[in-house]
Amino acid sequence: MKLLLSNDDGVHAPGLSALADELKNIAEIRVIAPDRDHSGASNSLTLTRPLILQKTSQGFFAVDGTPTDCVHMGLSEMFGYDAERVVSGINSHANLGDDVLYSGTVAAAMEGRFLAQPAIAVSLVNRGQENYATAAKVVANLLLRQLKSPIAPRTVLNVNVPDVPLEDIRGIQLTRLGHRLKGGEPHEIVDPRGRKRYWIAAAGEGDDAGPGTDFYPVEHNYVSITPIHVDMTRYDAFNQLQDWLGETE
């Protein structure tokens, strides 16, 4: 099994190192990640300048671009590595519900959708304990399970792991994406030169977050797994829109 690893927290993030340390025991790995934190980068590509690729002291590859840039390059013939699947993470915070629209972690995994094997995006629902080893063990177990029982290609498994020791994990639950409330207003600050600057507010609290959603299990020390893909079509709106379009003819 040949894995391409990436993330959005940056090439030096502890979650990426923990993931690489665990997965190298069960697979051949290659790591390519942004040279700095690109949280919230979503599926953006760098198209207005060339990218720089450097090798770190750990043997990882660092790119001065987005998570999607990294996986795009890592899967290219130029990179010379015939990866079978992409694993992205371990993100330092949750990627639940609407978070997947903004997440560079999920985007990096999604860029691996063209491979025959499903990609994995893994996040630690941080409670300040930094149990990255727990999340890494969960991913290793999922990969070994998929070898025995493959699932549909062009699928991304969005995995959220409670920030607890492995022995406190109660199990795994299959979930759908929940929803968050809208985030707060941008926070205004003034820099030392008197200029106004703004911080984007944190994500909103869970709204549709009950049983069956990805929010619920992690609050009860279960791992949440949500299968996602790129088709964002709202199929249940077809009939209403068809009626509306018919009225305009």
UniProtKB/Swiss-Prot annotation:
Domain of life: Bacteria
Catalysed reactions, semicolon-separated: a ribonucleoside 5'-phosphate + H2O = a ribonucleoside + phosphate
Keyword Glycosyltransferase assigned: no
Note describing how the cofactor binds: Binds 1 divalent metal cation per subunit.
Location relative to the cell: Cytoplasm
Broad enzyme group: hydrolase
Main location: cytoplasm
Descriptive protein name: 5'-nucleotidase SurE
Organism: Hahella chejuensis (strain KCTC 2396)
Lineage, opening ranks: Bacteria, Pseudomonadati, Pseudomonadota, Gammaproteobacteria, Oceanospirillales
Name of the gene encoding the protein in the UniProt record: surE
